[in-house]
């Protein structure tokens, strides 16, 4: 009994794993291996005496605690031992077979479960702290495998799972450092029948969809295993043939998708997409995206067998069976939610193979006999939030720079050149070196903007025509191309003699720089396309494509900034399958178009029909609509570029060009606002509201995500903020301002807490504007007083004669008529005002894109390489 008391006094009353981790050997620096070896010997002898005691002498739990104390001290010594093969302390542990003896004693004791828990902690401490490759020795890995096997056969308590998964992750880390461990822990390459058919990888599968740290550790460990499978094909074959890893991932996606809310409570009409970082408060969406991101990472690094099986299961088990039916629902709210989810999923994918699966699903699969992509295009023409969300998804798809998508939407209808006269085919490849199209775009800026625009020099006449305004702008901008820049963008610099228009001239130069960057990036990612789409003869093109192996390269998906390094990176099995069904068969059937959409196809026809109503559309509909058209303008393919940006091309009767539609819009908005008093003040306040909306949107995001207070009125009016927000560009609104707006509050049949409130709304209502006139806002609301603060009431001067009095009466009647029109048509006036503001900026952007398309072929090829 005296020995037991002595040993018990050495152990803490309640040792914990945290205490073990913080415990260090308090030994002087000069203590040699002999002293450490002596210390290990003392602890092991004490342990043997504890295990040899009768159970009646001391309780089993007390014996377990004392034994684990000594074992942890031995592990601490091993962790401090230098990397030798093996060191004296490790050699002593191996010779004594300490770990196996302790394991066997634990299985025969009355505290088997407690011993399992404590041994798992010991092995976690050993794996995480050991510097030597201790796991390669059978005296260590055999008892560890036996311990893991015994844990796998029973349900683990929750307080034990953390250490258990940590041990499994540590084994995956160690196997990546030493490939020898792959045979021992993953491939069952040992001769012990009691643990045959056992692999560490299979133990991780039940934790793949867990939340919290357990799920993170398990997924990280599996990714390490995937990296090993890419090195050793045996592991890849084992995962595919012997485990249910891939089916669990695919089924998990379907199950998590079914948990997503079926409707979105949209607080404002400026919303059209779900953004990363703003959906973090919704656990269902976070869980699905976590699983999707894990599948994406697995496909990136796993063995090709694992990739193929997982992709097939995701396509058939999730997309075809679940997503397809979700996209054919009858409820508009449900369709809006599913479309927004799909948009978010596509934007979250970074692996090209997984993106190919999603693109194939959109191009090949049908709902009610109609391809899913065609259904999305048809929804664009609706007057609902579904149309806006569908436009957002289309914009995301266009950002992929995918040949098959653009071919299906646009190019297959433009290839026959039925939209232009036969004599105009040569103009498809012409380059607008003299910027005639850019000048035409600028000439379409509404005349009411000329008084406010700062793009003209101060010497400009008071009432210039559209053409003279364009000429003045073109003369004011002198562009220098700095050819000395290597691997950089061409730099544009205004001449120092510009004075009155410096601010907006710099603004236009920024449009040019942004357009150049966007066009160059798009051109780089389209460089591997199989055709140039320049309007050449189809038969010769087909022959050249068949005979030239280089032209067989495909770019089904080059997503999220990926640039092809070789043809093998671009080609894929999906490209071949999608080719048979969607593209590459330019037969007579492909070229027979419906008469109603002759030459353009349903996508461009729907876009143009919606664009024709720009004066009546809401601000946010116009925002995403113009962004989609702008994204189409970035593509360098001559067929599409000439149709959208070439003013000189002659179209067939019945086919309207973008210039004709913009000219019609200009006339419409000018007709609406010609009777509006104080129009210039309304335009100024519309611009200010857009700047204020941007600042409030950013503050709302910060308050939701980081609990940052909304900026004050003074901070909004600061010079730095005003300079940063001076440009109201369509693409900037799209990429930053709208998408950074607050997310809709997700709701189920039973309510979930909504974050969409007045305090977090990114759009200004007519009553809560910080400006005194806050009566002109993109968001529809009460606009009854839109005209009163917007235009000051003119006071009639005193008159002494009848003619003067008659003039005053006529002036008063005209002003009364204008104010009456504004009071009776507040929605029309507001839409027209915001349409003018957007149209002016969009026309500048289109002009810049047109000029950059002409300039880019002049830049040396080495400057265009990444």
From Swiss-Prot:
UniProt region (Disordered), positions on chain: 739-761, 781-814
A Pfam entry, by short name: KELAA
Highest taxon in the source lineage: Eukaryota
Annotated Low complexity bias: 751-761
InterPro entries on file: FHIP, FHIP_C, FHIP_KELAA_motif
PANTHER family: FHIP FAMILY PROTEIN CG3558, RAI16 PROTEIN-RELATED
Family per similarity comment: Belongs to the FHIP family.
Protein's UniProt name: FHIP family protein v1g243165
């Amino acid at each position: 009994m005296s020995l037991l008391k002595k040993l018990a006094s050495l152990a803490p009353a309640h040792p914990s794993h945290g205490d073990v981790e913080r415990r260090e050997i308090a030994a002087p620096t000069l203590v040699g291996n002999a002293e450490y070896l002596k210390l290990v010997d003392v602890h092991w002898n004490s342990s043997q005496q504890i295990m040899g005691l009768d159970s009646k002498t001391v309780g089993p739990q007390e014996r377990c605690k004392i034994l684990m104390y000594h074992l942890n001290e031995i592990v601490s010594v091993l962790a401090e031992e230098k990397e030798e093969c093996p060191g004296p302390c490790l050699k002593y542990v191996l010779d004594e077979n300490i770990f196996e003896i302790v394991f066997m004693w634990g299985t025969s004791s009355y505290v088997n479960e407690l011993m399992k828990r404590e041994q798992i902690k010991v092995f976690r401490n050993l794996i995480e702290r050991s510097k030597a490759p201790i796991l390669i020795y059978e005296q260590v890995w055999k008892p560890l495998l036996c311990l893991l096997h015994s844990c796998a056969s029973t349900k683990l308590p929750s307080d034990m799972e953390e250490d258990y998964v940590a041990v499994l992750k540590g084994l995956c880390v160690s196997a990546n450092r030493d490939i020898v461990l792959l045979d021992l822990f993953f491939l069952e390459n040992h001769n012990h029948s009691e643990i045959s058919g056992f692999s560490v990888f299979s133990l991780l599968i039940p934790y793949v969809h867990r939340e919290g740290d357990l799920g993170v550790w398990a997924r990280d460990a599996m990714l390490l295993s995937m990296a090993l499978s890419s090195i050793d094909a045996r592991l890849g074959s084992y995962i595919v043939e012997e485990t249910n890893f891939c089916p669990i991932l695919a089924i998990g996606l379907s199950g998590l998708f079914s948990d997503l809310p079926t409707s979105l409570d949209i607080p404002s009409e400026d919303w059209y997409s779900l953004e990363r970082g703003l959906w973090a408060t919704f656990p269902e969406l976070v869980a699905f995206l976590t699983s999707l991101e894990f599948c994406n990472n697995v496909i990136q690094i796993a063995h090709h067998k694992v990739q193929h099986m997982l992709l097939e299961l995701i396509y058939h088990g999730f997309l075809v069976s679940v997503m397809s039916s979700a996209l054919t629902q009858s409820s508009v709210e449900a369709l809006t939610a599913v479309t927004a989810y799909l948009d978010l999923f596509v934007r979250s994918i970074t692996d090209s193979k997984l993106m190919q699966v999603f693109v194939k699903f959109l191009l090949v699969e049908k709902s009610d006999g109609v391809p899913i992509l065609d259904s999305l295009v048809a929804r664009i023409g609706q007057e609902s939030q579904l149309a806006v969300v569908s436009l957002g998804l289309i914009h995301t798809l266009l950002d992929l720079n995918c040949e098959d998508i653009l071919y299906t939407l646009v190019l297959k209808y433009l290839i026959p050149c039925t939209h232009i006269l036969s004599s105009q085919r040569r103009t498809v490849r012409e380059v607008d070196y003299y910027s005639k199209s850019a000048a035409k775009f600028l000439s379409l800026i509404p005349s009411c903007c000329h008084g406010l625009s700062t793009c003209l020099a101060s010497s400009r006449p008071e009432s210039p025509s559209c053409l003279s305004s364009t000429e003045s702008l073109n003369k004011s901008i002198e562009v220098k191309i700095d050819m000395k820049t290597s691997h950089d963008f061409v730099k544009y610099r205004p001449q120092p003699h510009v004075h009155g228009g410096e601010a907006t001239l710099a603004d236009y130069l920024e449009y040019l720089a942004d357009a150049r960057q966007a066009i160059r990036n798009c051109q780089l990612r389209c460089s591997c396309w199989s055709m140039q789409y320049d309007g050449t003869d189809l038969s010769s093109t087909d022959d050249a494509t068949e005979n030239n192996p280089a032209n067989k390269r495909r770019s089904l998906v080059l997503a999220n900034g990926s640039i092809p390094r070789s043809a093998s990176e671009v080609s894929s099995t999906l490209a071949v399958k999608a080719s048979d069904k969607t593209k590459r068969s330019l037969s007579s059937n492909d070229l027979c178009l419906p008469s109603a959409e002759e030459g353009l196809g349903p996508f461009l026809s729907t876009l143009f029909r919606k664009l024709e109503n720009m004066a009546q559309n809401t601000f946010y509909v116009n925002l995403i609509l113009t962004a989609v058209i702008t994204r189409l303008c970035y593509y360098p393919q001559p067929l599409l570029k000439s149709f959208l940006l070439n003013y000189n091309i002659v179209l067939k009767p019945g086919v309207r060009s973008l210039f004709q539609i913009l000219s019609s819009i200009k006339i419409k908005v000018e007709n609406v606002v010609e009777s509006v008093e104080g129009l210039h003040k309304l335009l100024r306040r519309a611009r200010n509201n857009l700047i204020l909306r941007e600042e409030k949107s950013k503050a709302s995001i910060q308050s939701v995500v980081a609990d940052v207070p909304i900026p004050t009125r003074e901070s909004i009016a600061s010079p730095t903020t005003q300079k940063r927000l001076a440009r109201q560009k369509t693409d900037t609104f799209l990429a930053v301002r709208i998408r950074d707006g607050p997310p809709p509050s997700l709701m189920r049949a039973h309510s979930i807490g909504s974050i969409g409130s007045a305090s977090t709304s990114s759009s200004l209502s007519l009553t809560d504007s910080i400006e005194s006139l806050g009566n002109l806002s993109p968001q529809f609301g009460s606009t009854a007083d839109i005209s009163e603060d917007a235009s000051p009431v003119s006071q009639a001067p005193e008159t002494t004669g009848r003619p003067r009095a008659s003039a005053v009466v006529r002036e008063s009647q005209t002003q009364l008529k204008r104010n009456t029109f504004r009071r009776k048509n507040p929605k029309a006036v507001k839409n027209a005002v915001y349409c003018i503001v957007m149209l002016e900026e969009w026309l500048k952007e289109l002009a810049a894109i047109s000029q950059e398309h002409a300039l880019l072929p002049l830049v040396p090829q080495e400057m265009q390489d990444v």
